[in-house]
């Protein structure tokens, strides 16, 4: 199962601190071999800036190591972080969470039947699918 973290605060927080520098940083939960072992298929963060969502994500197949430091200066009062343990879809950046559609963001833990969900999607949402994951299909 994936690892999810979210924060809402009155004042902007340094996202990197919570992911990599806190006494028990969030990234450490991805390194532990709990429930299926390391969550190193990909990672991503979504944060809100002036009422617009921004996303940074990386997939294991696209980088040698994860670059958590690339978000070192990000500040936001709302953010979501996801450490992926792939079950469906390759370990690529496009399959890393969170996903964005218009002004909505989504991250997911678990598995659903992708083909069954696609049957119920309107064609306009099917055209929006960018990943191979069940999660993005469920989101749309």
Language-model region placement:
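Extreme N-terminus nucleophile/cap motif
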Residues: 1-60
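Conserved beta-strand-loop-short alpha-helix elements that form
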Residues: 2, 104-116
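Fold-independent oxyanion-binding glycine-rich loops
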Residues: 9-10, 82-85, 109
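Short helix/loop capping segments that flank catalytic or ligand/cofactor-binding pockets
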Residues: 15, 55, 89-91, 114-117
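Short acidic (Asp/Glu) patches
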Residues: 29-30, 59-70, 81-102, 120-122
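Short, basic and Ser/Thr-rich N-terminal targeting/leader segments
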Residues: 39-43, 49, 74-76, 81, ...
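Residue-level signal for inorganic ion chemistry
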Residues: 45, 110, 138
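Short histidine
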Residues: 113-140
């Amino acid at each position: 199962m994936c690892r999810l973290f979210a924060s809402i605060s009155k004042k902007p927080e340094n996202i990197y601190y919570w992911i990599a520098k806190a006494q028990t940083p969030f990234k450490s939960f991805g390194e532990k071999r709990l429930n299926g072992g390391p969550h190193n298929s990909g990672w991503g963060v979504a944060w809100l800036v002036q009422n617009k969502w921004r996303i940074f994500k990386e997939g294991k197949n696209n980088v040698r190591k994860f670059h958590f430091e690339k978000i070192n200066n990000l500040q936001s009062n709302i953010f979501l972080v996801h450490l992926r343990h792939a079950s469906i879809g390759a370990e690529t950046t496009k399959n890393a969470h969170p996903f964005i559609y218009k002004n909505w963001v989504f991250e997911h833990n678990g598995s659903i039947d992708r083909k069954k969900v696609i049957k119920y999607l309107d064609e306009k949402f099917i055209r929006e699918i960018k990943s191979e994951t069940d999660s993005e299909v469920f989101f749309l």
